[in-house]
Regions:
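Active-site rim beta-loop-alpha module in soluble metabolic enzymes
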Residues: 91-159
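Glycine/charged-rich beta-loop-alpha catalytic/anionic-binding loops adjacent to active sites
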Residues: 23-31, 133-139, 172
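Metabolite-binding pocket within alpha/beta catalytic cores that recognizes anionic/polar moieties
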Residues: 1-103, 143
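Hydrophobic/aromatic beta-strand patches that form the interior of the parallel beta-sheet core
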Residues: 31, 61, 77, 116-121, ...
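Regulatory input/activation interfaces that engage signals or partners
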Residues: 168-214
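Short, well-ordered, mixed-charge alpha-helical segments that flank or form enzyme active sites
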Residues: 69-71, 86-87, 127-130, 154, ...
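Generic hydrophobic alpha-helical segments
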Residues: 40, 44-51, 133, 187, ...
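Active-site-adjacent mobile loop/cap segments within catalytic or ligand-binding domains
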Residues: 140-141, 145, 151-187
Length: 214
């Protein structure tokens, strides 16, 4: 499918092979953004130019997998806070750091109003609880870890785009990808149902009329 004026929802996925699903919904567009913050940002910036050229205002929905130490594999998360996961954010570096909140409308909040325990931390690595890096941040007890969401949410804040995310726990940050690899098939099979439920129960509350994707 080609992006067109009929598109109402754009589903952003890091890799179409990671979450393999299709949709016959002509108002839904699936867009691959690549893995990592830089790839995600560059891909979304390119997509944004196409969105502007068409004069449309779609909802952006990021769907993907996360590492999580608090919930079992297969658990579905709807993050409401986003932060850098591997950048130094102390002292004067805080002046250039945004802490983001929201599903739909994204806003920047002060650190004292930011809830790390409900936050998705974005970094360019698989998180391993046995590393020194994790030891430095484990006191924050974050909701989960991914590789794209903060960059996407930040861009949507700057461009005033509606942004939502659905994340599925694929590994428990144990230092291997064995859980991630084995869960992908099960996740792909559930994805259509998960998206339908999300659009019906959450997006409709915002008075956005979006048809089923499954």
């Amino acid at each position: 499918m080609i992006l067109n004026k009929e598109i109402e929802t754009i589903i952003l996925v890091a890799n179409k092979n990671e979450l393999s699903f299709t949709t016959e919904n002509k108002s839904t567009f699936i867009y691959e953004i690549g893995v990592g913050k830089v790839n995600a940002l560059l891909s979304l910036a390119t997509l944004y130019e196409d969105i502007k050229a068409l004069g449309i205002n779609p909802v952006l929905l990021n769907v993907g997998t996360v590492g999580c130490t608090r919930y079992p594999i297969g658990h579905v998360l709807y993050p409401n806070y986003y932060a850098q996961g591997d950048a130094y954010t102390d002292g004067f570096f805080l002046e250039n750091t945004l802490f983001l909140k929201g599903q739909g409308v994204i806003e920047s909040v002060s650190l004292d109003k930011f809830d790390y325990e409900e936050a998705l931390l974005t970094s360019d690595r698989f998180i391993n609880v046995n590393t020194a890096f994790y030891q430095d941040i484990k006191h924050l007890n974050p909701l989960a870890f991914d590789m794209e969401s903060y960059a996407l949410a930040n861009f949507c804040l700057l461009k005033n785009l509606p942004f939502h995310s659905i994340k599925i726990v694929s590994d428990n940050c144990d230092g291997t990808v064995k859980d991630w690899e084995s869960i992908l098939g099960e996740i792909s099979g559930r994805l259509g149902t998960i998206l339908d439920e999300f659009m019906r129960d959450r997006l409709v509350k915002e008075k956005i009329d979006i048809p089923s994707v499954s």
